[in-house]
Amino acid sequence: PRAAAAALLVPGTTCHDFAVERCETVPELDSDAYVLRHIASGARLLYLACDDENKAFAIGFKTPPADSTGVFHILEHSVLCGSDKFPVKEPFVDLIKSSMQTFLNAMTYPDKTIYPVATTNEQDLYNLMDVYLDAVFNPAIYTKPTIFEQEGWHYELDLPEGAEGEGDGSSASLREGTLRYNGVVFNEMKGALSDPMSVLDDAVNAALYPDTAYAHESGGDPRAIPALTYEQFLDTHARHYNPSNSYITLYGDLDADRALAFLDERYLSQPSA
C-alpha cells in the first residue's frame, strides 16, 4: 500500500479533486504521511499509509464554544440519531452490534469534535464511513426536533406518587407535580460536574483563558444547557458541520484511490455537503 500510495499521491498533483500538498515519512509510526486538500469543498485530509491491518477513518470539525450550553456536545450525540440515508433511531448502536469495527466512537473536546472508526475489513470501513459521513452532513435533526429534546434538554413533569397511574389527567394532579429538566447530555453533565475536581478544572480554565473558547465548559453546564434553543442548535450545525471546517484522517493498509474517490463522489462534491 505504501508503494501504491507513493505512485498515486505525488505532491503537486491532484487525485479525485484532492490536491496533494505534502508527503513526509513518519518513522515513529512506520508510515508515510500525505497532506491533501479537497479543491471544491476545502476539506483537509491526512492519510497515514502503512502496513497496519487496522484501517481507520475519522472526521473532525473545529468547534470552539461561545458559551457553556454544550451545543457541540449535544450535536455530537444528536447527529448519531439517524440521517437522510440511514433513518434509524440509533445507528451508532446498530454499528456496534453488526459491524466488524475495532473502534467506534465520537468525542467532544474543548475546541473540536471528532468522529473516529476503525476496522480490519476494508468493505466494513466504507460502510462505517458512509454512516458517519451521512450522520455529520445530513443528520435527521432538521426534521425531528425530538432528537434535540431527547439528547439536549426538555421539560418533564414529575407527578405525586400514585397520581401517574390514575390516568385521570386531573388539573389538581398536574398542579401538584414538579417540573424539572431532563435530557441525555443534561444528565451526563450533571454527573460529570458533581465531581469537585471537574468544577475546579472549569474554574481554572476560565481564570487562565478569559474571553476564549477554553473559558467555557464544552460539554455543557447544566445551569446553562436549558438556555440553548432548537433554532440555535440547528444554526450551529449549519455553520460548523461543513467540509470547509473539517479535517479527515485515513490510516492503514487501504486503497487510497478508492478511498479518495468515495469521499469526493459521495460527499465532498455533493451540494448537501
Where would I find each of the regions flagged by the language model?
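Secondary-structure transition/turn motif
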Residues: 39-40, 50-51, 62-64, 120-121
